[in-house]
């Protein structure tokens, strides 16, 4: 079983979603998890303990394991991510330029089949629509929406 598959099986078995996995050159393994209710420190501890056990049993070499939430600027990688965050502000970078540009920022529309829509501000300030597929994307992230005024 490959590392990604092993980790995804473990994480989903605990009731979480594997958002991303990074392995650095210094033996660090970074795992990003999420769930609809959000991620707490206890969730990260639970997944860390289980992964430490699984990685030891499977004899996977690593120096340090880090489990965390994907953060406010969470990456969007799967079609389910685009469905879940429809209506949110996102930044999308395409692999190839479209109309002379690769990076777009706008409001995500729910996917229609394999096609994902992004409403953005066009060249003359008017609303424009970009349609793309997962295969067109280099990277996509949520734009954090933070409101400090609501805190007392």
Curated annotation (Swiss-Prot):
GO terms under cellular component: cytosol
Keywords, ordered alphabetically: Cytoplasm, Ribosome biogenesis
Pfam families per UniProt: DUF150_C, RimP_N
Subcellular location, record wording: Cytoplasm
One GO term of the biological process aspect: translation
Keyword hit for Cytoplasm: yes
Disulphide-bonded residues: none
Alphabetized SUPFAM superfamilies for the sequence: YhbC-like, C-terminal domain (SSF74942), YhbC-like, N-terminal domain (SSF75420)
InterPro entries reported for this sequence: Ribosome_maturation_RimP, RimP_C, RimP_C_sf, RimP_N, RimP_N_sf
Function: Required for maturation of 30S ribosomal subunits.
Family: Belongs to the RimP family.
Protein name, entry field: Ribosome maturation factor RimP
Originating organism: Burkholderia ambifaria (strain MC40-6)
Gene from which this protein is expressed: rimP
